[in-house]
Swiss-Prot record:
Modification Phosphoserine occurs at: S50
Compartments where found: Cytoplasm
Function recorded in the entry: Catalyzes the last step in the trans-sulfuration pathway from L-methionine to L-cysteine in a pyridoxal-5'-phosphate (PLP)-dependent manner, which consists on cleaving the L,L-cystathionine molecule into L-cysteine, ammonia and 2-oxobutanoate. Part of the L-cysteine derived from the trans-sulfuration pathway is utilized for biosynthesis of the ubiquitous antioxidant glutathione. Besides its role in the conversion of L-cystathionine into L-cysteine, it utilizes L-cysteine and L-homocysteine as substrates (at much lower rates than L,L-cystathionine) to produce hydrogen sulfide (H2S).
EC number assigned by the record: 4.4.1.1, 4.4.1.2
Transmembrane parts of this sequence: none
Top-rank lineage group of the source organism: Eukaryota
InterPro entries found in the cross-reference section: Cys/Met-Metab_PyrdxlP-dep_enz (IPR000277), Cys_met_metab_PP (IPR054542), PyrdxlP-dep_Trfase (IPR015424), PyrdxlP-dep_Trfase_major (IPR015421), PyrdxlP-dep_Trfase_small (IPR015422)
Protein name: Cystathionine gamma-lyase
Length: 398
């Protein structure tokens, strides 16, 4: 059991997680060299034994030894039977929606990553899909939104950037009253270490591996994990047909990142909690949002559903947009940048940066105001992070 999580009342850590992260996938026995580090297979094509008879690989878009090792590793960490990798998180999203046809309806969480919102609102809707944005944290609203045409429900938990939670198990029970609806959970913020959506009833667990799963801000990638053989076959066909697969080198980097996922996430949790507590006690801060804090309205759900919390902390600085901008101008350790989940600490202003594509009216409804600041708390020394935040807050409010 993870010490920090268990002492805070969260679920115990998933058994054998670190061992699987290190050993599942690139087993040395599969290579003639017995290399203990995953080899990078850059070949685009593979020699066949006879016409139409291969030894497992034909063309790198359809399958690659390095990519296969990563997919095997992620499947184990997600508690899944299968995993598919994609060139981007949005490539994974696009591929999933190709399971549908024109006229089908998608229910999407009202608050999601800005790129997901933009894709559903401005791209998928142009191809005959009907998109409804619903607050799926309120299960009655989800149930009321389902129609005979609903074929996919997309939830993100915690949401980006206000860290609202959806009860995955409750959503799954509602969705699966209807046999032909697929429940997708975007698990980017939690990673496989803190949350396993498939075990809670989701049909598809997807995430942007760009963030915590890789953890080094040097790979852009999407992951999709499933337990259903049927879904795997359909998605595997689409993966090959659409061709949005990652490079072997990126697969190598991500597989390497997984080796330290456990120790990284534990440090993110410790630092995230320390930052959240510091901000909550600071008079220059209006409100702090962090599922690990008892003040979070869904703190109990977080403890039932997760083994801990990542380093994502959002807060409202007192004042106006100008105060937020002065704060962001004065941070030193926290880099002003989009993205999240790397070893380095980042800060951003969602209303102007990651969620600028969300309509202003929707941002106001969701609480994405000009004073909302999102932090991705990294792995630096806790004391240094708190000092940096403290001096930047003082600069914003002398």
């Amino acid at each position: 059991m993870q010490k920090d999580a268990s002492s805070s009342g969260f679920l115990p850590s998933f058994q054998h997680f670190a061992t699987q992260a290190i050993h599942v996938g690139p087993e040395p026995e599969q290579w003639s060299s017995r290399a203990v580090v995953l080899p990078i297979s850059l070949a685009t094509t593979f020699k066949q034994d006879s016409p139409g008879q291969s030894s497992g690989f034909v063309y790198s878009r359809s399958g690659n030894p390095t990519r296969n090792c990563l997919e095997k590793a992620v499947a184990a960490l997600d508690g899944a039977k299968h995993c598919l990798t994609f060139a981007r998180g949005l490539a994974a999203t696009t591929t999933i929606t190709h399971l549908l046809k024109a006229g089908d309806e998608v229910i999407c969480m009202d608050e999601v990553y800005g790129g997901t919102n933009r894709y559903f609102r401005r791209v998928a809707s142009e191809f005959g899909l009907k998109i409804s944005f619903v607050d799926c944290s309120k299960t009655k609203l989800l149930e009321a939104a389902i129609t005979p045409q609903t074929k996919l429900v997309w939830i993100e938990t915690p949401t980006n950037p206000t860290l609202k939670l959806a009860d995955i198990k409750a959503c799954a029970q509602i969705v699966h009253k209807h046999k032909d609806i697929i429940l997708v959970v975007d698990n980017t913020f939690m990673s496989a270490y803190f949350q396993r959506p498939l075990a809670l009833g989701a049909d598809i667990c997807m995430c942007s591996a760009t963030k915590y799963m890789n953890g080094h801000s040097d790979v852009v990638m999407g992951l999709v994990s499933v337990t259903s053989d049927d879904l795997n076959e359909r998605l595997r066909f689409l993966q090959n047909s659409l061709g949005a697969v990652p490079s072997p080198f990126d697969c190598y980097l991500c597989c390497r990142g997984l080796k330290t996922l456990q120790i990284r996430m534990e440090k993110h949790f410790r630092n995230g909690m320390a930052v959240a507590r510091f901000l909550e006690s600071n008079p220059r801060v209006e409100k702090v949002i962090y599922p690990g804090l008892p003040s979070h309205p869904q703190h109990e759900l977080a403890k039932r559903q997760c083994t801990g919390c990542p380093g994502m902390v959002s807060f409202y600085i007192k004042g106006t947009l100008q105060h937020a901008q002065v704060f962001l101008k004065n941070i030193k350790l926290f880099a002003l940048a989009e993205s999240l989940g790397g070893y380095e600490s980042l800060a951003e202003l969602p209303a102007i940066m990651t969620h600028a594509s969300v309509p202003e009216k929707d941002r106001a409804t969701l609480g994405i105001s000009d004073t909302l600041i999102r932090l991705s708390v990294g792995l630096e020394d806790e004391k240094d992070l708190l000092e940096d935040l403290g001096q930047a807050l003082k600069a914003a409010h002398p």
